[in-house]
Amino acid sequence: MSANVLSSLLRLLRHTGLRIGALLLSASLAACGGGVSLGFGYVDYDDDYDHDDPYHPDWPGGGTASDPGIFLIAGGLCPTCGGSLDGSGSAARFDAPEGIVLGPDGNLYVAERASGTIRKVSQQGVAVTLAGSAGASGSSDGAGGAARFNGPTRLEADIDGKLYVTDSGNSTIRQVSAGGAVTTLAGAAGQCGSQDGSATNARFCNPQGITLDRNGNLYVADTMNHTIRRIDRNNAVTTVAGVAGACGSADGRGAAARFCEPRDIEVDDDGYLYVADSANSTIREVSPSGEVRTVAGAAGQCGTADGPGASARFCNAAALTIDGAGTLFVADTGNGAIRRIGSSGAVSTVVGTPGTQNVVLGPLPGSLNAPRGITVLAAGSLAATSQNMVLRLVPAR
């Protein structure tokens, strides 16, 4: 099977929850190791029968987790429950978790920015450290705890289980094997710049978003260069859109376009890129030919309005993901909410209460605190990072 087909298959699996042999990527999320938390309290709910999926516990007091709501997967149940600690459910701790992705093994992987680690969260809500050492910042390749990162922000997974990480504080792109071995793929640690060319000669500046297309190309939101970069399968780096150092907002082709601190990027099956243009509070689209247009929001207008794309408003949206139907979900960080952009371009709020920066778990609307990472699971559910937690979200249909 070709690498292109494998890449396409991974994206299909991530967005549809199909099975191949014994591999099930249909993952919904377990709450607190057998319990469900409401608000910041914890309700111990023991059950003695199997569920269709270990990430789908029942709600205490009736109903099921397939009902719209917000569920805890792992992390502390209070605003000050930080730190970095392996453990199960609410016993685990995260320190500024940001990017999140569903791997081909059915586990979630999280870039833990403040601790400088990559964490793995099982379908049972057990969090372990895959690579890096909490609190030990630096840039070292190596296996597991011997590796060092400096503010890893987002990550992507391929069909083989390799992770691609934007090591933002080092201005590099790192690769993590399924076993936790870390190598530097592109850029040079501590050298913020903008240079195309071979991976070793290329330079980035605080890159944050990263995505993988069906042809095996990586695309990077090079945040402080205000550009979109591509790393092809030969590890050659090129600039796709924007101009290094030119913060602004302009639609157009390639170098005629302008971004301002783009923080995340996602690609659909047709090769269109979607960018969370955070400082502009807009969502942008980049066509395969490099044509950039604004999909939703208005540059420089931070707000909460739902509605048609041009009428909608976001506030420092920092992350996005796309499902198999082409629906975009946006982690609207400054508003503390998850927004949906349908095929018509209409924007709606599907999780959280815009303007309320607080985590309240349970039935919708609930609320979130500065969600910074989001990924698609199966059957219409999402996983997100918010505050110091990893959450499962079931938007209203």
Go through each PLM region and give its residues.
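Residue-level detector of Asp-centered blade-edge/turn motifs that repeat once per structural unit
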Residues: 102-105, 157-160, 212-215, 267-270, ...
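A short loop-to-beta-strand structural motif that recurs across blades of beta-propeller domains
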Residues: 116-120, 126, 171-175, 181, ...
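Gly/Pro-rich loop segments of beta-rich domains
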Residues: 62-98, 126-153, 181-208, 236-263, ...
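A generic tandem-repeat structural signature
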Residues: 151-156, 167
